[in-house]
Structures are given as structure tokens and as C-alpha cells.
């Protein structure tokens, strides 16, 4: 079973309108929860300033204020694959979180795999993030 996990901003009420706004903005990820609970996954862009502003999935951000991307694992031993414009730029096994630097403008996203499940599930993504757009 695939599930869409919608991210609603903390200052917004949990209602139909904020739900629709979050989906329109791309503030969500897809989790194949039949393979395990994906609640708690996170993929954000982190700003350069002192406040380290966070840019969530679906956000558009200029390249200049962006220092890194961070992804949070929901369990140890997961394989994360980072993409830019559809091509793989980074792949690693993660126990809690990982970060990588943006490589210029483009469309960035991550996929998470559970290699511990073995074939055929280790070849299909468990979590698919929505992209962050770097302009």
C-alpha cells in the first residue's frame, strides 16, 4: 500500500483548506508503508544564514542561500539515493541522517531503499521524496 504523507505547516490549522494547499505546493512524500512505517522521514534544503532556514519538499529556492540538503532516516541501515534532474548524484547507507551539498541549479530529490528486505523489495524504493527546486 502506498501512502502520501502530507506536510502541513505548524502555524496552519489541520483542515481541508491547509491540506489542499500543502498538496498543491508539493509538501509531501510517497511512502510504501506496506514495507514498513515511513512516518518521520524528512528531506529539506538548509539555508546559509544564522537561522538555517529550512526549505521543505516542493519548495523553490535560489541557489545562493542554500548550503546543504538534509535527509532524515526513520530506521538504521537504509540506502539513500539522491538525484539531480533525474540523474543519481549520491548514494549511501544511512543510520540516522545524511546531508549533501547542492551542485548548482536543478531539481533535487531522494529515494530510500530497504536492502534488508531482500529481493525483490530491495530494488524498489520504499520512500520517494517530492523535489526541492533550486533556481
Enumerate the language-model features and the residues they cover:
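C-terminal functional module detector
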Residues: 1-135
Amino acid at each position: 500500500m502506498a501512502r502520501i504523507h502530507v506536510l502541513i505547516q505548524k502555524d496552519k490549522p489541520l483542515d481541508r483548506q491547509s491540506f489542499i494547499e500543502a498538496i498543491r505546493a508539493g509538501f509531501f512524500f510517497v511512502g510504501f508503508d506496506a514495507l514498513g512505517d515511513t512516518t518521520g522521514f524528512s528531506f529539506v534544503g538548509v539555508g546559509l544564514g544564522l537561522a538555517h532556514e529550512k526549505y521543505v519538499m516542493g519548495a523553490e529556492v535560489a541557489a545562493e542561500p542554500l548550503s546543504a540538503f538534509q535527509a532524515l532516516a526513520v530506521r538504521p541501515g537504509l540506502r539513500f539515493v539522491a538525484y539531480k534532474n533525474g540523474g543519481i548524484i549520491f548514494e549511501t547507507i544511512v543510520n540516522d541522517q545524511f546531508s549533501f551539498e547542492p551542485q548548482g541549479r536543478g531539481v533535487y530529490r531522494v529515494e530510500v531503499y530497504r536492502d534488508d528486505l531482500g529481493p525483490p523489495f530491495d530494488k524498489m524504493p520504499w520512500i520517494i521524496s517530492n523535489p526541492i527546486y533550486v533556481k
